[in-house]
Protein backbone atom coordinates (compact mmCIF):
# COMPACT_ATOMS: atom_id res chain seq x y z
CA UNK A 1 0.00 0.00 0.00
CA UNK A 2 1.35 3.41 -0.94
CA UNK A 3 1.66 6.12 1.70
CA UNK A 4 -0.81 8.95 1.25
CA UNK A 5 -1.15 12.31 2.91
CA UNK A 6 -4.72 13.26 3.83
CA UNK A 7 -6.22 16.33 5.45
CA UNK A 8 -6.59 14.33 8.66
CA UNK A 9 -2.91 13.40 8.72
CA UNK A 10 -1.45 16.58 7.23
CA UNK A 11 -2.50 18.86 10.07
CA UNK A 12 -1.08 16.65 12.86
CA UNK A 13 2.09 16.31 10.77
CA UNK A 14 2.28 20.10 10.60
CA UNK A 15 1.93 20.17 14.38
CA UNK A 16 4.83 17.75 14.69
CA UNK A 17 6.94 19.93 12.38
CA UNK A 18 6.07 23.00 14.46
CA UNK A 19 7.00 21.08 17.61
CA UNK A 20 10.35 20.12 16.10
CA UNK A 21 10.84 23.77 15.20
CA UNK A 22 10.44 24.70 18.87
CA UNK A 23 12.79 21.89 19.93
CA UNK A 24 15.39 23.07 17.43
CA UNK A 25 15.17 26.63 18.72
CA UNK A 26 15.40 25.54 22.36
CA UNK A 27 18.36 23.27 21.70
CA UNK A 28 20.23 25.88 19.67
CA UNK A 29 19.85 28.56 22.31
CA UNK A 30 19.78 26.68 25.61
CA UNK A 31 21.60 23.34 25.36
CA UNK A 32 25.37 23.54 25.63
CA UNK A 33 26.28 20.43 23.67
CA UNK A 34 24.12 21.56 20.75
CA UNK A 35 25.70 25.02 20.83
CA UNK A 36 29.16 23.45 20.72
CA UNK A 37 28.17 21.25 17.81
CA UNK A 38 26.66 24.29 16.06
CA UNK A 39 29.96 26.13 16.35
CA UNK A 40 32.08 23.16 15.31
CA UNK A 41 30.02 22.55 12.18
CA UNK A 42 30.08 26.24 11.29
CA UNK A 43 33.85 26.35 11.80
CA UNK A 44 34.29 23.51 9.33
CA UNK A 45 32.18 25.25 6.71
CA UNK A 46 34.00 28.53 7.32
CA UNK A 47 37.39 26.85 6.93
CA UNK A 48 36.30 25.49 3.56
CA UNK A 49 34.98 28.90 2.61
CA UNK A 50 38.42 30.41 3.14
CA UNK A 51 39.94 28.26 0.40
CA UNK A 52 40.78 29.77 -2.98
CA UNK A 53 37.88 30.08 -5.38
CA UNK A 54 35.19 29.05 -2.92
CA UNK A 55 33.83 32.42 -1.83
CA UNK A 56 32.78 33.77 -5.27
CA UNK A 57 30.86 30.59 -6.05
CA UNK A 58 29.35 30.47 -2.56
CA UNK A 59 28.28 34.11 -2.83
CA UNK A 60 26.54 33.50 -6.14
CA UNK A 61 24.69 30.37 -4.99
CA UNK A 62 23.72 31.74 -1.57
CA UNK A 63 22.39 34.96 -3.04
CA UNK A 64 20.00 33.06 -5.29
CA UNK A 65 17.73 33.01 -2.24
CA UNK A 66 18.24 36.64 -1.30
CA UNK A 67 14.97 38.60 -1.66
CA UNK A 68 15.48 40.27 -5.04
CA UNK A 69 16.94 37.32 -7.02
CA UNK A 70 14.43 34.98 -5.36
CA UNK A 71 11.51 36.94 -6.76
CA UNK A 72 12.71 36.21 -10.29
CA UNK A 73 12.12 32.46 -9.99
CA UNK A 74 9.95 31.81 -6.90
CA UNK A 75 6.81 32.17 -9.02
CA UNK A 76 7.77 29.31 -11.35
CA UNK A 77 5.99 26.55 -9.35
CA UNK A 78 2.81 28.65 -9.32
CA UNK A 79 3.04 29.16 -13.07
CA UNK A 80 3.56 25.43 -13.64
CA UNK A 81 0.50 24.62 -11.52
CA UNK A 82 -1.65 27.14 -13.40
CA UNK A 83 -0.46 25.86 -16.79
CA UNK A 84 -1.37 22.34 -15.69
CA UNK A 85 -4.89 23.46 -14.81
CA UNK A 86 -4.33 23.28 -11.05
CA UNK A 87 -5.36 26.73 -9.75
CA UNK A 88 -5.91 25.45 -6.21
CA UNK A 89 -2.41 23.98 -6.13
CA UNK A 90 -1.08 27.32 -7.41
CA UNK A 91 -2.91 29.10 -4.60
CA UNK A 92 -1.53 26.65 -2.03
CA UNK A 93 1.98 27.26 -3.36
CA UNK A 94 1.49 31.01 -3.03
CA UNK A 95 0.35 30.51 0.57
CA UNK A 96 3.39 28.34 1.34
CA UNK A 97 5.91 30.75 -0.15
CA UNK A 98 4.37 33.82 1.46
CA UNK A 99 3.55 32.21 4.80
CA UNK A 100 6.88 30.47 5.32
CA UNK A 101 9.04 33.42 4.39
CA UNK A 102 6.92 35.90 6.34
CA UNK A 103 7.00 33.63 9.40
CA UNK A 104 10.78 33.49 9.31
CA UNK A 105 10.93 37.26 8.85
CA UNK A 106 8.80 37.73 11.98
CA UNK A 107 10.57 35.10 14.08
CA UNK A 108 14.04 36.53 13.55
CA UNK A 109 13.62 39.71 15.64
CA UNK A 110 11.22 38.03 18.05
CA UNK A 111 13.75 35.34 18.99
CA UNK A 112 16.90 37.41 18.53
CA UNK A 113 19.54 36.51 21.09
CA UNK A 114 23.35 36.48 20.90
CA UNK A 115 24.82 33.01 20.92
CA UNK A 116 28.17 31.87 22.30
CA UNK A 117 31.05 31.69 19.84
CA UNK A 118 33.94 30.53 22.00
CA UNK A 119 34.88 27.72 19.58
CA UNK A 120 34.91 29.90 16.49
CA UNK A 121 38.15 31.26 15.06
CA UNK A 122 38.40 33.66 12.16
CA UNK A 123 34.61 33.86 11.90
CA UNK A 124 32.83 37.20 12.14
CA UNK A 125 30.17 37.48 14.82
CA UNK A 126 26.83 36.33 13.46
CA UNK A 127 23.94 38.67 14.19
CA UNK A 128 21.57 37.89 17.04
CA UNK A 129 18.57 37.80 14.69
CA UNK A 130 19.76 34.85 12.60
CA UNK A 131 17.34 32.07 13.60
CA UNK A 132 15.68 30.69 11.55
CA UNK A 133 17.55 31.24 8.31
CA UNK A 134 15.60 33.15 5.70
CA UNK A 135 17.72 31.70 2.91
CA UNK A 136 17.10 28.14 4.13
CA UNK A 137 13.37 28.87 4.41
CA UNK A 138 13.28 30.27 0.89
CA UNK A 139 15.28 27.40 -0.60
CA UNK A 140 13.29 24.63 1.07
CA UNK A 141 9.89 26.22 0.49
CA UNK A 142 10.76 26.56 -3.20
CA UNK A 143 11.90 22.92 -3.35
CA UNK A 144 8.72 21.64 -1.68
CA UNK A 145 6.49 23.81 -3.85
CA UNK A 146 8.27 22.52 -6.94
CA UNK A 147 7.40 18.98 -5.84
CA UNK A 148 3.72 19.90 -5.49
CA UNK A 149 3.58 21.70 -8.83
CA UNK A 150 5.39 19.14 -10.95
CA UNK A 151 3.69 16.41 -13.02
CA UNK A 152 3.41 13.11 -11.18
CA UNK A 153 5.90 11.29 -13.38
CA UNK A 154 8.54 13.97 -12.80
CA UNK A 155 7.96 14.46 -9.10
CA UNK A 156 10.68 12.00 -7.89
CA UNK A 157 13.28 13.78 -10.02
CA UNK A 158 12.06 17.22 -8.96
CA UNK A 159 12.28 16.19 -5.30
CA UNK A 160 15.91 15.15 -5.69
CA UNK A 161 16.87 18.26 -7.65
CA UNK A 162 14.98 20.53 -5.26
CA UNK A 163 16.74 19.01 -2.27
CA UNK A 164 20.10 19.43 -4.01
CA UNK A 165 19.26 23.08 -4.65
CA UNK A 166 18.38 23.67 -0.99
CA UNK A 167 21.57 21.94 0.16
CA UNK A 168 23.71 23.95 -2.26
CA UNK A 169 22.24 27.23 -1.03
CA UNK A 170 22.67 26.29 2.63
CA UNK A 171 26.20 24.95 2.23
CA UNK A 172 27.10 28.18 0.44
CA UNK A 173 25.91 30.60 3.10
CA UNK A 174 27.39 28.40 5.83
CA UNK A 175 30.74 28.59 4.04
CA UNK A 176 30.31 32.36 4.13
CA UNK A 177 29.45 32.13 7.85
CA UNK A 178 26.14 33.95 7.51
CA UNK A 179 24.28 31.52 9.77
CA UNK A 180 24.67 28.72 12.28
CA UNK A 181 23.70 25.22 11.09
CA UNK A 182 20.75 25.22 13.50
CA UNK A 183 19.41 28.23 11.60
CA UNK A 184 19.25 25.99 8.54
CA UNK A 185 17.19 23.35 10.33
CA UNK A 186 14.87 26.07 11.62
CA UNK A 187 14.31 27.37 8.11
CA UNK A 188 13.66 23.87 6.79
CA UNK A 189 11.05 23.24 9.48
CA UNK A 190 9.26 26.55 8.90
CA UNK A 191 8.93 25.66 5.22
CA UNK A 192 7.79 22.13 6.04
CA UNK A 193 5.17 23.31 8.54
CA UNK A 194 3.59 25.69 6.04
CA UNK A 195 3.70 23.09 3.29
CA UNK A 196 1.84 20.56 5.41
CA UNK A 197 -0.74 23.14 6.49
CA UNK A 198 -1.38 24.25 2.91
CA UNK A 199 -1.56 20.71 1.55
CA UNK A 200 -3.88 19.71 4.39
CA UNK A 201 -6.22 22.58 3.56
CA UNK A 202 -6.01 21.72 -0.13
CA UNK A 203 -6.93 18.10 0.47
CA UNK A 204 -9.82 19.09 2.74
CA UNK A 205 -11.54 20.95 -0.09
CA UNK A 206 -14.18 19.08 -2.12
CA UNK A 207 -12.87 18.42 -5.61
CA UNK A 208 -13.61 16.43 -8.72
CA UNK A 209 -9.98 15.54 -9.36
CA UNK A 210 -7.04 14.88 -7.02
CA UNK A 211 -5.65 18.08 -5.52
CA UNK A 212 -2.18 16.63 -5.84
CA UNK A 213 -1.91 14.35 -8.88
CA UNK A 214 -1.33 10.64 -8.38
CA UNK A 215 1.90 8.80 -9.00
CA UNK A 216 0.56 5.44 -7.87
CA UNK A 217 1.65 3.76 -11.09
CA UNK A 218 5.26 4.33 -10.13
CA UNK A 219 6.68 1.69 -7.81
CA UNK A 220 8.14 3.00 -4.58
CA UNK A 221 11.62 1.80 -5.43
CA UNK A 222 11.46 3.60 -8.77
CA UNK A 223 10.14 6.76 -7.13
CA UNK A 224 13.14 6.68 -4.79
CA UNK A 225 15.57 6.25 -7.67
CA UNK A 226 16.50 9.93 -8.17
CA UNK A 227 17.00 10.48 -4.44
CA UNK A 228 19.16 7.36 -4.21
CA UNK A 229 21.12 8.56 -7.23
CA UNK A 230 21.70 11.91 -5.50
CA UNK A 231 23.09 10.18 -2.42
CA UNK A 232 25.30 7.91 -4.52
CA UNK A 233 26.47 10.85 -6.60
CA UNK A 234 27.37 12.87 -3.52
CA UNK A 235 29.23 9.90 -2.09
CA UNK A 236 31.05 9.36 -5.37
CA UNK A 237 32.09 13.01 -5.50
CA UNK A 238 33.42 12.77 -1.96
CA UNK A 239 35.42 9.67 -2.92
CA UNK A 240 36.88 11.43 -5.96
CA UNK A 241 37.98 14.37 -3.83
CA UNK A 242 39.48 12.01 -1.28
CA UNK A 243 41.37 10.11 -3.98
CA UNK A 244 42.65 13.33 -5.53
CA UNK A 245 43.89 14.77 -2.23
CA UNK A 246 43.93 11.92 0.30
CA UNK A 247 46.19 13.47 2.92
CA UNK A 248 44.42 16.84 2.94
CA UNK A 249 40.96 15.26 3.07
CA UNK A 250 41.82 12.79 5.84
CA UNK A 251 43.53 15.50 7.87
CA UNK A 252 40.58 17.86 7.49
CA UNK A 253 38.05 15.15 8.35
CA UNK A 254 39.96 14.14 11.47
CA UNK A 255 40.11 17.71 12.74
CA UNK A 256 36.49 18.44 11.80
CA UNK A 257 34.63 15.26 12.71
CA UNK A 258 31.53 17.08 13.95
CA UNK A 259 31.45 19.12 10.76
CA UNK A 260 31.46 15.98 8.61
CA UNK A 261 28.49 14.59 10.53
CA UNK A 262 26.66 17.92 10.53
CA UNK A 263 27.14 18.53 6.81
CA UNK A 264 25.85 15.04 6.04
CA UNK A 265 22.88 15.56 8.37
CA UNK A 266 21.85 18.80 6.64
CA UNK A 267 21.93 17.10 3.25
CA UNK A 268 20.00 14.07 4.47
CA UNK A 269 17.34 16.20 6.18
CA UNK A 270 16.81 18.23 3.00
CA UNK A 271 16.55 15.07 0.91
CA UNK A 272 14.26 13.40 3.44
CA UNK A 273 11.85 16.35 3.49
CA UNK A 274 11.58 16.67 -0.28
CA UNK A 275 11.41 12.92 -0.86
CA UNK A 276 9.01 12.45 2.04
CA UNK A 277 6.60 14.97 0.55
CA UNK A 278 6.88 13.28 -2.83
CA UNK A 279 5.98 9.92 -1.29
CA UNK A 280 3.32 11.34 1.04
CA UNK A 281 1.20 12.77 -1.76
CA UNK A 282 1.21 9.52 -3.70
CA UNK A 283 -2.20 7.93 -4.31
Predicted segment positions?
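N-terminal transmembrane-helix/juxtamembrane module of multi-pass inner/ER membrane proteins
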Residues: 1-73, 108-124, 257-264, 275-283
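Hydrophobic alpha-helical transmembrane segments
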Residues: 8-20, 36-45, 104-109, 129-138, ...
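Interfacial segments of alpha-helical transmembrane regions
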Residues: 8-16, 79-100
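Alpha-helical transmembrane segments
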Residues: 12-22, 99, 228-236
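Transmembrane helix-loop junctions in multipass membrane proteins, especially transporters and channels
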Residues: 33, 86, 109-117, 156, ...
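Structural signal for the C-terminal ends of transmembrane alpha-helices
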Residues: 79-87, 146-153, 200-206, 275-282
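Membrane-embedded catalytic cores of phosphoryl/pyrophosphoryl-handling enzymes
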Residues: 120-266
Amino acid sequence: MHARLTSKSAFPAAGVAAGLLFVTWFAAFHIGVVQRADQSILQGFSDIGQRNGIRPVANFVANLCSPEPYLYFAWIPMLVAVMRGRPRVALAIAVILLGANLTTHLLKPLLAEPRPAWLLHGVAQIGAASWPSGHATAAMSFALCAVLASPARLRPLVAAVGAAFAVAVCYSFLALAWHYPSDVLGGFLVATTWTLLAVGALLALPQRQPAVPSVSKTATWRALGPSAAAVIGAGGLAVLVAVARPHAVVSFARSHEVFVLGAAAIALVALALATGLMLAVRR
